[in-house]
Amino acid sequence: MMEMKPFENSKKIAFDLFYVQMVWTLWYVSFLFVVQFMMLLLPDFIKLNVSDAESPASMYFMNFGLTASKTYMLVIGIISSYAFLKHYIHQGVTRKDYFVGSTIAVILLSILLPILMWILSGVQYLILGWAGIPRQESVVIGYEMFSLMPFIIFTLQFLVYYLAGWMVSMSFYRFGFFGGMLSIPVGLAGLILLDMVWGGRDAEKLLSDWLPIYPIELTTTTAMLTSLVLAAVFILLHRLISRNIVIKIK
């Protein structure tokens, strides 16, 4: 049983959850890094039906891993409620302490992942330069790869994706299958809006046959504020759903 002060509980939970998910993330980025290198070194054996601008050889690792990393954050957000909530509540942690600690861990993880991708992009740049492997130097979002802005943009997007998955999984945990299904359109709408304000094409490619989805021309500041609002909405929804949740024994 945890008998520390409430804030001490939250800090310990934040550290524990951040550490566990950091280990997952290190395995994930290592795997993704190896996958892209295989695509670069064996282009004749690994062919993708994409344009030259979209091929792995045209991107540094940070750009190559953007879409996959958003999906990764969504998935571990979905996993988190089922993986951690019951354990901590059974240890005597209050729902509020768990919520605060989890939120801190999510923010830290959303900062860590772009840092890891940033570092590996630099490693990749040095290795490919040393090996003499030619490549284009395209940058997805129009900023220099090693400036601060891509780091901020990636952090915000990863945060919102995790929080969307977190909110959806908590809805399934509390309300069951049918109640949880109602949360999916809410999460999906938030992610579509996020993709649109950042001028991404992921939502457009997936859903343009069914929905009128187009990138929205916004300033970077407005897009950042929109991302923060979406993050706040998902955090609030998660808190409302989890506040009086009944923990399942099995």
Predicted stretch roles:
Residues 1-58, 197-250:
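Hydrophobic alpha-helical transmembrane segments
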Residues 93-97, 169-179:
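Membrane-interface helix-boundary motifs at transmembrane edges
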Residues 37-67, 105-175:
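Secretory targeting signals
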Residues 71-78, 156-164, 226-238:
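Hydrophobic cores of alpha-helical transmembrane segments in multi-pass inner/ER membrane proteins
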Residues 75-95:
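Transmembrane helix boundary and interhelical loop/hinge segments in multi-pass membrane proteins
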